[in-house]
Curated annotation (Swiss-Prot):
SUPFAM superfamilies: ClpP/crotonase. The active site is at 98 (nucleophile), 123. This is ATP-dependent Clp protease proteolytic subunit. It comes from Neorickettsia sennetsu (strain ATCC VR-367 / Miyayama) (Ehrlichia sennetsu). GO terms for cellular component: cytoplasm; endopeptidase Clp complex. Its EC number is 3.4.21.92. It holds the Pfam family CLP_protease.
Length: 201
């Protein structure tokens, strides 16, 4: 059983208790953790849309610790990040693998980060198909189309050539933060907050 810590806020109307994730959502912090599937993706999309409605001009901060998951679920998060007006800053804590690495790379330019001991893994989409030969052929075509689409997304956000991206994604490729920065998946490695980062403007 997962226990979610509660925090108490002091307000003019008295004390109010929040679970820790809801409290951080008030500060425009979104957590993308665990396997990426449709239910989880819907929760992330809903939070992004809510924060845009709250303030379309203020950045959103997404902390990522995920092994990846369903490609289409990951793409729904990606498309929403590109669709909304606020910039989304992405931070890898722990790991960003598969679809999660694509989301990490698609953060706002100059605002994509990783902590020093995090790991990034990229690869091409995969799928197990069984059934009639014709159905298998249809699914193979779809996977190849997804592969081209994902390569183009990485190319757009990293600035690398399609040929370099294809080579990088051909097999499971594990990257240190330094290597992820070199290929353009992140912009910088962060070890500590800036001294004034917690102060109100």
């Amino acid at each position: 059983m997962n226990l979610v810590p509660m925090v108490v806020d002091q307000t003019p109307r008295g004390e109010r208790a929040y679970d820790i994730f809801s409290r951080l959502l008030k500060e425009r912090v979104v957590f993308l953790t665990g396997p990426i599937e449709d239910g989880m993706a819907s929760l992330i999309v809903a939070q992004l849309l809510f924060l845009e409605a709250e303030n379309p001009d203020k950045d959103i901060f997404m902390y990522i610790n995920s092994p990846g998951g369903v490609v289409t679920a990951g793409l729904s998060i990606y498309d929403t990040m590109q669709y909304i007006k606020p910039s989304v800053s992405t931070v890898c804590v722990g790991q960003a693998a598969s679809a999660a690495s694509l989301i990490l790379a698609s953060g706002a330019e100059g605002k994509r980060f990783a902590l020093p001991h995090s790991r990034v893994m990229v690869h091409q989409p995969s799928g197990g198909v069984r059934g009639q030969a014709t159905d298998m052929e249809i699914h193979v075509k779809e996977i190849l189309q997804l592969k081209r689409m994902i390569n183009e997304i990485y190319q757009k956000h990293t600035g690398e050539t399609i040929k370099k991206i294809e080579t990088l994604l051909e097999r499971d490729t594990f990257l240190s933060p330094e290597e992820a920065k070199k290929v353009g998946i992140i912009d910088d490695i962060i070890t500590q907050r800036k001294e004034n980062s917690g102060k109100q403007e």
